[in-house]
Amino acid sequence: MGRNNKNKNTTNMKKLLLIMLAMVALQLNAQNVEHYSKMVKELSSKKYMGRGYAYDGANKAGKYIEKEFQKAGADEVICQPFKLNINTFPGKMSLKVDGKKLTPGIDFTMREFSPGAKGTFKLYHIDTANYDSKKIFADLALPENKDAFVVCDFWFTYKHGADFKRLQSKECPNAGLIYTWSDPLLKFYKAYGERVIEKPMIWVSSSFPKDAKSVTMDIEHEFLQDYECFNVIAKVEGKRHDKCYVFTAHYDHLGVLGKKTYYPGAHDNASGTAAIITLAEHYAANKPEYDMYFIAFSGEDAYLRGSEWYAEHPIVPLSQIKYLFNLDMIGDNNPVQYCEVSDPGMDGFKLMEKLNNENKYFKSLNRGELAGNSDHWPFAQRGVACIFLENAEGDAFQYYHTVMDTYKTFFPDSYEPTFKLITDFIEKY
């Protein structure tokens, strides 16, 4: 065989090998995305009742995550317990307006700090266009308005804050408050659920009748005192132990609104939780240079309780963290990735931008103002180099904190570029 034929054969073999390697890589990526999506589906299922504190939903999800970290090949998995006080709504959740039944999570939600209520109540509507504070409180003092529920619009709470607070207190004889939500989809929160106020407070959709006369309700709440939950921490040992990388995501969500309505939280934040499990699996199979820690936090939607606890009780000194990645809501289809970066993390962010520009993982990285909106915050406050990655404003984002944040409205599109950006960064940082 001549030299030219040998060279041609060698070239052809190289091409074939490259094609085969590319096909294997594509297959592995497809399997990775499939495994990732399967975990998102599991975590957002009814089994975990919205990963809240009623029905022990969050802790059940935590046990599932612990097992997934173990299956991923982590060298060590531990649970870090902590306690919180939290208001929940696990029982009756019935509300009718002028005899018409409203649907929890769609037509109405509870403020997270609201007590329950039972009975039929007259409605007193506040006219914010022709606002007269003295007249309102004089009207509410009349015998015929005793124990009425006050109805106002969403912006009343901002425009007339002092009066709004007065309506919440026993100083005013109204039985409770109802106010209309401004967006098409009702949201639910847990951030201020560590207390219970004196009167029931209900959010209703913009379709709530402006001329409604009365409401009938049977709503139960349960305040959990010193409820024990836990962070799940997995470790993959590296070649060096003087520094480490940390990957975080919160696995808790909003829980339930009565016995039948739950908040699945596929995008927020089953998506981020599943992602750090796949990252643990990746580094367990590819021994890293530095130790890797993967922390699934509970209590985030209860205002960063789990991450704050960990930051105060770290299992390795915070000074050893080389870089921390917080993944919160990465299950969307926006080609632009939102992020927030701590001051010590800016050098790393510049490298991330460079890698993103070279490889086109995302159209761009849109850096916003650093804020206390997710689990990176307690670390940023303590001088840790960190970044918060969130895929917001895509088609899934409209369902944020609603009962419609389901596996069906979740998109895995942003998962793979996020995974590649992170692993590429760690290889070069």
Predicted regions and their residues:
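Soluble metallo-hydrolase cores and metallopeptidase-like ectodomains found primarily
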Residues: 115-134, 183-264, 281, 285, ...
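His/Asp/Glu-rich mid-to-C-terminal helical/loop segments that flank catalytic regions of hydrolases
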Residues: 281, 396-429
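Noncatalytic luminal/extracellular "stalk/propeptide" segments of secretory-pathway proteins
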Residues: 49-161
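Bacterial Sec-dependent N-terminal signal peptides
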Residues: 1-32
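Catalytic-core environment of secreted peptidases
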Residues: 32-48, 53, 64-72, 76, ...
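N-terminal capping segment at the start of a domain
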Residues: 32-56, 72, 78, 92-97, ...
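Metal-dependent peptidase/peptidase-like ectodomains
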Residues: 288, 297-397
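Second-shell loop/turn segments in exported
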Residues: 46-56, 81-83, 153-157, 220-222, ...
